[in-house]
Amino acid sequence: DLYIYHMWDYHTPMEDIMDGLDKVVKAGKARYIGISNCFAWQLAKANFYAREHNMSEFISMQGHYNLIAREEEREMIPFCQSEQIALTPYSPLAGGRLAKQPGIMTKRLKEDTYAKFKYDQTAKMDQEIIDRVYKLAKKHQVSMSEISLAWLLTKVSAPIVGTTKLEQIDAMVKATEI
């Protein structure tokens, strides 16, 4: 029911994008539209245009946000909160970095080239946060995933999570109870 426009298209006029997405909603193929990977000014401009032309507006924003990646706090989150746009961030566990005890290497941490691209450059700076999450998890006898997701759930509508094991789903559910 929510169609998420994945990434801002710099080669297509914004008016054409909004017209096309509005047609998707009016045709009943989706109830709502959301967007991912854009700047706050782009979201504001698109929704202003949609409002002025009686079109569907973006009702959710899927940005890169977690305890390590917090750039969204600068402009996007305040904007979305002021406009009542749902926040549905991706990579809530930083590609597994906020889920694994420091020093433990998993297959995903070794092989996920996209996450390496996002996090390897700042690994030394991020380690302090990862260590703090580990200490809090140990202190409260919960998993690092639970601590990381519990923090995020105080900030956003619904994080987009991915799992490879059944027990990871349990940790995600338990995070709602912290």
Q: Where do the model's predicted regions map?
A:
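Phosphate- and divalent-cation-binding pockets in alpha/beta enzyme and binding domains
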Residues: 41-45, 97, 168-171
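Short, hinge-like loop/turn segments at secondary-structure boundaries
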Residues: 50-54, 77-79, 104-108, 176-178
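Glycine-rich beta-alpha junction loops
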Residues: 39, 65-69, 91-98, 151, ...
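Glycine-rich, positively charged active-site loop/lid region within alpha/beta enzyme cores that binds
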Residues: 81-136, 155-157
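Conserved short secondary-structure transition element at the edge of the structured enzyme core
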Residues: 25, 92, 121-178
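Glycine/proline-rich, positively charged
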Residues: 1-71, 75
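Conserved, mostly hydrophobic/aromatic
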Residues: 13, 33, 61, 80, ...
